[in-house]
Every structure is written in C-alpha cells, then in structure tokens.
Regions:
Chain A
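Short, polar loop motifs at secondary-structure junctions
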Residues: 39-46, 96-100, 205
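Short, acidic, metal-binding catalytic loop of nucleotide-sugar glycosyltransferases
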Residues: 27-34
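A glycosyltransferase accessory/donor-loop signature
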Residues: 1-7, 18, 38, 51, ...
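Class I SAM-dependent methyltransferase SAM-binding "motif I" and its flanking Rossmann-like core
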Residues: 115-127, 131, 136-139
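Conserved hydrophobic/aromatic beta-strand scaffold that supports enzyme active sites
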Residues: 80, 144-146
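Active-site-proximal specificity loops/subdomain of glycosyltransferases
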Residues: 45-84
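A short, glycine/small-residue-rich beta-strand->loop->alpha-helix junction that serves as a flexible
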Residues: 12-21
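GT-A fold catalytic core of metal-dependent nucleotide-sugar glycosyltransferases
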Residues: 73-124
Length: 268, 101
C-alpha cells in the first residue's frame, strides 16, 4: 500500500508557485514522511531546482481563468486521481503550511475521500462560514483532500471534471458568480452529485481548516527550515485606524490566503 | 525575521480571545482517535460511559454517527491515555498564555 502527497503548481505572472511547492514539499517530507508528486508545466520548471520531487508530471495547463486581473491557473485539479502514483493520496494546495503530522490521521478515517467543510480564521475564529450563495450549500474546501484509489473516489474526480467543464451552468443553478473558477465550489457540487445529492459525515475531515486570512500575515519565529512557531499579525480596522493585533502559534498546520505573506514566509 | 522586534515596532497588541480559540481548536483535534473501526473523541462523556459500563463489548455511536461495537477496556485505555496527554499539554500552553495578561 503506497502513500504520498500530490501538489499542483503552475507559475503565474505574479507568483512563483513552483517555489511554493518546493517549500511545502520539504515540509511534507519532514513532518508526514511522505513522497511528493508535483503536477506542473514545462515553463514553471526552474533551471536550478531546490528540491527533488518523487515524481514530476508535466501537463498542459488551462490558463483560462482570471482573478484580480491576473491569470490564475487552478483548473484541472480533477486530474489528481489519474496522475497520483499512490494508493492513498493527500492532495494539498501549495500554500498550505505543514507543521505537524496531523494530516496522517486522514488515512486512518474509514473513508476513501475526505475534505474540510469548516474553516476558522486564525485572528477571526468566529467568522461566518462561506456559502456558494444565500440559498445554496456551505462551501467545501479543496485545500486538503485525502483520497484512496477506489471506484467511488474516481467517480468523485470525474464529477469534478464535469462540474469544471459546465461551471457556468452550475453557477446559474446555485446563483454564484461564474467569472472566476473556484475548485472549492466545484468540489462542493461534485461530492454531493457523486453521493446521490447528499453529504456523508465520513467525507468530512473531523477538524477545521485554519486560514491565515487576507489582512493577516504569518512570520516564522526562527530561521530554522522546519520551524513550527509563528507570530500571526492582523490589521484590525477600527474607526478608520489600523490596530495591529497578534498571537503566537506552534505545531499547527495552516493555509495562507495572503499570497504575499506566503512568499515572505518561504523567502525568510 | 525577528518577530519580537516586529511586534514592538508595529505596537501590536496580543489578542487573548484569538489565542484561546486557536488553543482550543488545536487540542480538540488532538483528542480525535481512530480506533476499532470508529472515530472517537477522547472526551469526558465517552470516557465516563466506558468506565461505568460493565460488559466487555459495548456499542457506541462514533463521530461519523455509525454504531460501532468495541472492546470496552481497550478503547477506554486508549481514550484515557490520549485525554491525559493532550489535556496536560493544553493546560501547559494555556498557563503560558495566561502569563501574558
């Protein structure tokens, strides 16, 4: 029984996703003890790599997605099932900072596919959960997915492909904006379709996904490559003024939404 | 990055509520145990029930809402061990946090 992690990384004009993937892969190796397969394209490959991936799969990326006036290459996540060489896979976003072995617990769950349905923001723990639209579902998160090579998992990824290819149709039905393709939204719909239009409790990772949100930055407390202690700082706007607030965290995995903060973190 | 200087220069204030919420979340996760075909939380309620039951085998509803037959003593021992280790660490980190007041 083989286990490993899969990352997708396609450089955009604004961000170097390949170097983000190298940073994340090193931490996956260190904290989870798993090999990492990278799915990328020829143009993202650096001349001097910083990390030796277990496998590199070169694909032709779909660049037909624009976010904040820049190309955002996030389509094609459904290919993870076919390209993963492992029997059991953890599929992660490249901006997920692994600081513990917690994700290994997902392999022990009695399911062949699971993802997060609840998030918490590190400096805003009671923030409301995201929904597709006012009359639709609570969003599932494609940031962390564990899947095993089974017929059902394959079906879920096929549904993900189908939703991606008919995204406008689903956006019309569920009243969300189709302009920017979101893997989270596609997953929310695909998992329900594959499950006969319901959500199974066992498909949900039984802890929350922690975000470092938009007005928040994470700083490593030491220069150690595998540092697990961070200062998280938040710009709290009050009466037209910014009040800086912070907390210290350790041994906790988190997802960085603020890409500038993530780039600072990997360059420290 | 010298984060201590960063905090001083930014005149940042420590946010106790967010820190408490982070600690709770972190340690609640560690209380989760996959054992004997079910998913369990090492909480007071489950531990008390397992301690009070008399039979070797009991049927419990796990976190996925499935009824699972378990060996009572084995599960009790695993949950007690997890509970005591995790709560000790949580208490220690919480005590350090309280000193920041």
């Amino acid at each position: 029984m083989s286990r490993g992690a899969v990352l997708f990384a396609f450089n955009s004009p604004k961000y170097n996703y390949y170097s983000m993937a190298e940073f994340t892969a090193k931490r996956i190796n260190h904290f989870l003890g798993l090999p990492v397969t990278l799915i990328t394209d020829e143009s993202s490959l650096p001349e001097v790599p910083n990390f030796k991936f277990d496998n590199i799969v070169l694909v032709e990326p779909d660049k037909n997605n624009i976010r904040d006036y820049v190309v955002w290459i996030n389509k094609g996540r459904y290919q993870a099932y076919d390209y993963s060489p492992y029997d059991e896979t953890i599929l992660l976003d490249t901006d997920y900072v692994v600081n513990s072995d917690k994700l290994l617990k997902t392999f022990d769950l009695d399911t062949d596919f699971c993802c997060h349905d609840t998030t918490s923001f590190l400096m805003h723990p009671k923030a409301p959960q995201e929904v597709l639209s006012a009359y639709s579902f609570k969003t599932l998160w494609a940031t962390v997915i564990m899947f095993k090579k089974t017929k059902r998992a394959k079906h879920i990824f096929e549904c993900l492909e189908m939703v991606q290819k008919n995204y406008e149709h689903y956006a019309n039905i569920h009243s969300f904006i189709a302009g920017v393709y979101r893997n989270d939204y596609a997953l929310t719909l695909a998992l329900r379709i594959a499950n006969g239009h319901q959500l199974l409790p066992s498909d949900i990772i039984p802890w929350n996904l922690w975000h470092v949100g938009k007005n928040t930055s994470a700083y490593a407390d030491s220069a150690d490559e595998f540092n697990t202690e961070y200062t998280v700082m938040f710009d709290n706007w009050q009466r037209g003024k910014i009040r800086k607030e912070y907390i210290n965290i350790k041994d906790m995995d988190f997802h960085v939404m603020n890409k500038e903060s993530f780039m600072e973190l990997i360059n420290e | 990055m010298d984060t201590k200087n960063l905090i001083i220069e930014a005149k940042a204030r420590f946010n106790h509520n967010s820190a408490k919420a982070y600690l709770k979340e972190k340690y609640q996760t560690r209380l989760i145990v996959a054992e004997q075909g079910g998913l369990w939380r090492a909480n007071v309620e489950t531990i008390t029930f397992l301690s009070m039951a008399k039979t070797d085998k009991v049927i419990l509803i796990d976190s996925f809402e499935n009824p699972v037959e378990v060996n009572r003593e084995e599960l009790l021992s695993k949950l007690l061990e997890t509970y005591s280790t995790v709560m000790k660490e949580w208490h220690q980190e919480w005590s350090e946090l309280e000193k920041k007041r």
